[in-house]
Swiss-Prot record:
Name this polypeptide is given: Eukaryotic translation initiation factor 3 subunit I
GO terms, biological process: formation of cytoplasmic translation initiation complex
Keywords from the named record: Cytoplasm, Initiation factor, Protein biosynthesis, Repeat, WD repeat
Similarity annotation: Belongs to the eIF-3 subunit I family.
Gene name tied to this protein: tif34
WD repeats: 8-47, 50-91, 93-135, 150-189, 194-233, 291-330
């Protein structure tokens, strides 16, 4: 598995995202730049410039017409993917830590930071696609159609469950909440991770019936979207920043490493800066992929399950296209199932 090294950022990566077709990869970092890449060969398509602060988060609409970014300049920006122009700016009182389109692309949620007397919130906007040809995209709602305030512990990450039925949020105190996607009412709250160990990432399975969380408590959990039941736990030996569920094979990929500020002059091996592959069902670690010389801040997997990408504190995005042995790998029990 030879990685493709994408070098377009001067500072550490915050989030990377494949579009639904998997032909494009978007990356955002602390250097105020959004990059778009061809995922097949790592060629850079272009950049989206306009933010005045570090960009924390990115998401692309299911039809790849719009791109949303959230930044430390207290704005969410909506971009025309094709032309690179900014079609809408929403201002907030604090930084925006996560944006996510609903599964049908009709709504966009934004998670805002708790700071300067403002409570952390999740704002939901209705999204308009103009004539569907990528024109008239400027005509967007000014105000959110729904606002959820996190009075207990601020939300750090959030996403949509199947059909946009629930909004699932991960919190600073290690808990996971389920809100009604239409009314914003809190339905469920579960202490999924150790208390006061922040949840750094939430990513959903392809059908969005379950999701995986990555936490500072050195573990990742597979949780049901319907009732927040904890289905599986993947224990690592380092704080985790990101986790994703692979299609095609029953694996999960975890990314982490010793926190950037705790890294002294250790060797890359001691810092544990590797992508870890675990078996989704059996919870065993099955392999690691080295390469970054700093913690992995974000991982995402190609929607066809043929490749994965990781973005690190070192400012590089690495795209790995899986080889045949990856797809051939099976546990004995899985082989027996196939023989039947």
């Amino acid at each position: 598995m030879r990685p493709i090294l994408l070098s377009g950022h001067e500072r550490s990566l915050n989030q990377i995202k494949f579009n639904r077709d998997g032909d494009l990869l978007f990356s955002v970092s602390k250097d105020k730049v959004v990059c778009a890449w061809w995922s097949a060969n790592g060629e850079r398509l272009g950049t989206y410039t306009g933010h005045q602060g570090a960009i924390w988060t990115v998401d692309v609409s299911p039809n790849t017409v719009l791109l949303a970014t959230g930044s430390a300049d207290n704005t969410v920006r909506l971009w025309n993917v094709k032309t690179g122009e900014c079609v809408k700016v929403w201002d907030f009182p604090t930084a925006v830590k996560r944006v996510a389109f609903s599964p049908d692309g009709s709504k966009l949620l934004a998670v805002t930071e708790k700071r300067m007397g403002f409570l952390g919130t999740i704002a939901v906007f209705d999204i308009n696609y103009g004539n569907g040809q990528g024109e008239d995209l400027e005509n967007q709602a000014e105000e959110p159609s729904l606002r959820i305030t996190c009075s207990e512990s601020k939300a750090t990450v959030a996403g949509w469950s199947y059909l946009g039925k629930y909004i699932i949020a991960g919190h600073e105190d290690g808990s996971v909440s389920q809100y009604d996607g239409k009314t914003g009412e809190q339905l469920e709250n579960v202490q999924a991770h150790e208390f006061d160990h922040q949840i750094n990432d939430i990513q959903f399975s392809q059908d969005r019936t379950c999701f995986i969380t990555a936490s500072k408590d050195k573990s990742a959990k597979l949780i049901s979207s319907r009732n927040l039941a904890i289905l599986k736990t993947y224990v690592a030996d380092t704080p985790l920043n990101s986790a994703t569920i692979t299609p095609k094979k029953d694996f999960v990929i975890l990314g982490g490493g010793q926190a950037a500020m705790d890294v002294t002059t250790t060797s890359a091996r001691q810092g544990k800066f590797e992508a870890r592959f675990y078996h989704k069902v059996f919870e065993d670690e099955i392999g690691r992929v080295k390469g970054h010389f700093g913690p992995l801040n974000t991982v995402d997997v190609h929607p066809n399950g043929t490749a994965y990408a990781s973005g690190g504190e070192d400012g590089y995005v690495r795209v790995h296209h899986f080889d045949k042995p990856y797809f051939d790998f099976m546990y004995e029990v899985e082989r027996e199932q196939l023989r039947k």
